[in-house]
Amino acid sequence: MIENVEFGLEIEGIPKMVRRRRSQEMIELVGLHGFENRYPKELSGGMKQRVAIARALAKEPEILLMDEPFGALDQQTRMFLGGELLRIWEETKKTILFVTHDINEAVLLATHVWVMSSRPSIIKKIVDIDIERPRDVKILSSERFRELTGQLWDVLRPEAEKALGARALKA
């Protein structure tokens, strides 16, 4: 798995010693120390997502782009990885552009949520998430969390009705 994390650095011509050190640091950051020599088939879905995050962070991007990274995972793994991403953000302070269709995930992770309209997609509203950091999944039960998710649903519902058809949501 460590070679997977190193791959982007190798393509850029980064020397092997530097690649290995940086990759090892990122593997530790995402909590996969001890799994460096495992093959993809030996890793869970959540571990594979953490490898992808480590690989992206190893390249030291200014902005980390994440498009539905937890979409194919079960709810428990999503919550765990959401907590891990919050921890990683606290350590790195990297700007992360995170695309999700999950309102709870958006409020948990974001500083700002950009709500997009259905076709044609435009920014319909930007909602500032004013929940203090550091955060963890315990905020899911807070009153402010419920207020923000409700506010987002109020903006999203008309868009969902357009995209899915009003009858689908009334059923």
What do the PLM-derived regions correspond to, one by one?
Residues 94-99:
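Conserved H-loop
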Residues 116-148:
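Conserved beta-strand-loop-alpha-helix hinge in the C-terminal portion
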Residues 64-67:
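Catalytic Walker B motif of ABC-type/P-loop ATPase nucleotide-binding domains
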Residues 78-92:
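Helical segment within the ABC ATPase nucleotide-binding domain
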Residues 38-41, 59:
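Conserved signature/switch motifs of ABC ATPase nucleotide-binding domains
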Residues 6, 10-13, 17-35, 87:
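Conserved ABC ATPase "signature" region
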Residues 53:
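Hydrophobic anchor residue at the start of the ABC signature
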